[in-house]
């Protein structure tokens, strides 16, 4: 959620910090601030509530000296409102040190009372200032930033990433993480810290991901990682697979428009190198050995939001192909209901960032109960893959818009690959069936391109409906999670009421919502796959149309049965039915984006939302 940047190097810290925070805006925030060690050795800070532009305007009107060491932060409020005072950094040791923080310090009230009893004072409502004041006290006792920092983080409870600097040690930044992201960037004569690699990818693509309960100290020439007890830790470097230009708009009106246009490539890149001779072979999973998968007797997919809907789509395919029971659980509900877990349970987690706190906690809970774990993730160096037996990366590229589009189709494609790989190992599909499925799957990217060609028609529809106050979405089978995702996108981007339903539930309550003019999107299944299911959906369309609904059908090319009953029909190319979600979701994404644009809303940074939810 919060964005964090740290830098030690040459006298360009303002450039690095502000540029890094700009690339972390997608994480969601309501205030921003920086702290810099000035050339004269003093600590200079600036922070403001509001967007990053407010901070940059402040710096233009009231400049602070540049320097070679600094930390920067974008805040998503948890403790205390979005005010200048509550914005980070927070100061300690009489303004000689600065701290920034992502996460929640659960025992901050106890620590605050302890410090108040010693007559320390506080200016903000935040838990972060407690850490800053505590660090100032410990620094005075220890005389060393690293030693004081180690003492402080060992006392903190909760999930957090913490960065600090002190003017007495002007070429040092220290950081720590527990259940919250922190990545190191390795430069020449300079080093970086960030919530993710986007913070520093403009300057270096060489990175290190530190583990749980670890502390990092960076100077211009050195990076040191220890555990919370001070013992040295070896960390493996990795290379970021994309450069800074991939996280820029490149002439598009919004990141969301750009990322929707990139969906064919997102799917193609996820599939690339993972099939041979008509069968799926995923190197990351094959390395675990067949026995790992043959021992599975149930699969539980854990995820939140859009990722959970990707999991629902994937569950239909995995269960059909591999003949293993598959359930999909919301991560934040999973571990609180005492689920039945055994050594035969495989947990498949889905998280674009690999840092979603609820999903991370679900994976840890399942692992402690004896489950195996695989993660589907789009971000190198993330925490959840490191907590799993293996990671299946989607290679969708950086997704900057807060509401997910290309990561969603990448996740579905990855789950299809996993299902086909599992079926091959378990022998539940013939060689011919595997070849046919692989061929159909690898044909999807070009079919997505064909759907994108109808974007102008969909945009026109959205602009016509810009005063709509409520929209319903219906689907059956794999169309049901697409209906859920279509409704979520509209809520996220256009701030209007939208609900997704299984079409079979219509007569069990939701039909009461139908009134004249009510817009209803219907994801129509292919009649080539199940004529019975197709007829039922057409019947549902007739039922709502009879009550005055305005029906927008998403149907495959050549399906004439919907024409007499739909007000508008958006066509998608013919595809194997299980793969249709990768096509039918595209018009719904475009519609939600264009409706938000018609209302004059920010489609990249919707209100109140964060890209990566790193607190529970």
Curated annotation (Swiss-Prot):
CDD domains: GFAT, SIS_GlmS_GlmD_1, SIS_GlmS_GlmD_2
GO molecular function: carbohydrate derivative binding; glutamine-fructose-6-phosphate transaminase (isomerizing) activity
Pfam families recorded: GATase_6 (PF13522), SIS (PF01380)
Active site residues according to the UniProt entry: 2 (nucleophile), 611 (for fru-6p isomerization activity)
InterPro entries in UniProt: GATase_2_dom (IPR017932), GFAT (IPR005855), GFAT_N (IPR047084), GlmS/AgaS_SIS (IPR035466), GlmS/FrlB_SIS (IPR035490), Ntn_hydrolases_N (IPR029055), SIS_dom (IPR001347), SIS_dom_sf (IPR046348)
Function: Catalyzes the first step in hexosamine metabolism, converting fructose-6P into glucosamine-6P using glutamine as a nitrogen source.
PANTHER family in alphabetical order: GLUCOSAMINE--FRUCTOSE-6-PHOSPHATE AMINOTRANSFERASE, ISOMERIZING, GLUTAMINE--FRUCTOSE-6-PHOSPHATE TRANSAMINASE (ISOMERIZING)
Name assigned to this protein: Glutamine--fructose-6-phosphate aminotransferase [isomerizing]
Organism: Leifsonia xyli subsp. xyli (strain CTCB07)
């Amino acid at each position: 959620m919060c964005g964090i940047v740290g830098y030690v190097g040459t006298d360009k810290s303002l450039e690095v910090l502000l540029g890094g925070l700009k690339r972390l805006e997608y994480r969601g925030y309501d205030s921003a601030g920086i702290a810099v060690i000035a050339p004269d050795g003093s600590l200079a800070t600036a922070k403001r509530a509001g967007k990053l532009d407010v901070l940059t305007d402040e710096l233009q009107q009231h400049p602070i000296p540049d320097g070679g060491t600094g930390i920067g932060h974008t805040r998503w409020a948890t403790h205390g409102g979005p005010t200048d005072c509550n914005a980070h950094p927070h100061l300690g040791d009489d303004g000689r040190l600065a701290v920034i923080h992502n996460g929640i310090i659960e025992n901050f009230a106890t620590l605050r009372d302890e410090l108040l009893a010693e007559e320390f004072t506080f200016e903000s409502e935040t838990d972060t200032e407690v850490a800053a004041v505590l660090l100032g006290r410990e620094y005075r006792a220890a005389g060393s930033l690293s030693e004081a920092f180690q003492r402080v983080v060992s006392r903190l409870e909760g999930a957090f990433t913490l960065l600090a600097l002190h003017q007495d040690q002007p070429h040092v930044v220290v950081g720590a993480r527990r259940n919250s992201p922190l990545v190191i960037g390795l430069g020449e004569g300079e080093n970086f810290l960030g919530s993710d690699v986007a913070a520093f990818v403009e300057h270096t693509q060489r990175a290190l991901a530190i583990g749980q309960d670890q502390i990092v100290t960076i100077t211009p020439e050195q990076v040191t990682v220890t555990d919370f007890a001070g013992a040295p830790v070896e960390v493996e470097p990795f290379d970021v697979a994309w450069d800074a230009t991939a996280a820029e708009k490149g002439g598009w009106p919004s990141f969301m428009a750009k990322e929707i246009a990139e969906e064919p490539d997102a799917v193609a890149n996820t599939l690339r190198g993972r099939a041979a001779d008509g069968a799926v072979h995923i190197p990351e999973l094959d390395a675990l050995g067949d026995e790992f998968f043959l021992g599975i007797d149930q699969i539980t997919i854990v995820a939140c939001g859009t990722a959970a809907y990707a999991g629902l789509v994937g569950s239909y395919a995995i269960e059909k192909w591999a003949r293993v029971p598959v359930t999909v659980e919301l991560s934040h509900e999973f571990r609180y209901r005492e689920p039945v877990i055994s050594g035969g349970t495989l947990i498949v987690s889905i998280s674009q960032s690999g840092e979603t706190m609820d999903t991370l906690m679900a994976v840890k809970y399942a692992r402690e109960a004896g489950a195996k774990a695989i993660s589907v993730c789009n971000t190198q160096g993330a925490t959840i893959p490191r907590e799993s037996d293996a990671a299946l990366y989607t290679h969708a590229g950086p997704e900057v818009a807060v509401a997910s589009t290309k990561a969603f189709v990448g996740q579905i494609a990855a789950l299809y690959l996993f299902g086909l790989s599992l079926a091959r190992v378990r022998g539940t599909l013939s060689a011919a069936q595997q070849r046919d499925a692989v061929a159909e799957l690898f044909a999807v990217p070009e079919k997505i391109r064909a759907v994108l060609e109808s974007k102008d028609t969909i945009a026109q529809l959205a602009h016509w409906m810009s005063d709509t106050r409520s929209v319903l979405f219906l689907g059956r089978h794999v169309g049901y999670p697409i209906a859920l995702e279509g409704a979520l996108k509209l809520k996220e981007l256009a701030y209007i009421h939208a609900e997704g339903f299984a079409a079979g539930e219509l007569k069990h309550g939701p039909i009461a919502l139908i009134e004249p003019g009510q817009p209803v999107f219907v994801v129509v299944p292919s009649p080539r796959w199940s004529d019975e299911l197709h007829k039922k959906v057409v019947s549902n369309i007739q039922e709502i149309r009879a009550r005055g609904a305005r029906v927008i059908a998403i149907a495959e090319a050549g399906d004439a049965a919907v024409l007499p009953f739909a007000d508008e029909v958006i066509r998608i190319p013919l595809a194997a039915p299980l793969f249709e979600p990768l096509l039918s979701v595209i018009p719904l994404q475009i519609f939600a984006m264009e409706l938000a644009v018609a209302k004059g809303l920010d489609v990249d940074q919707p209100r109140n939302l964060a890209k990566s939810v790193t607190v529970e």
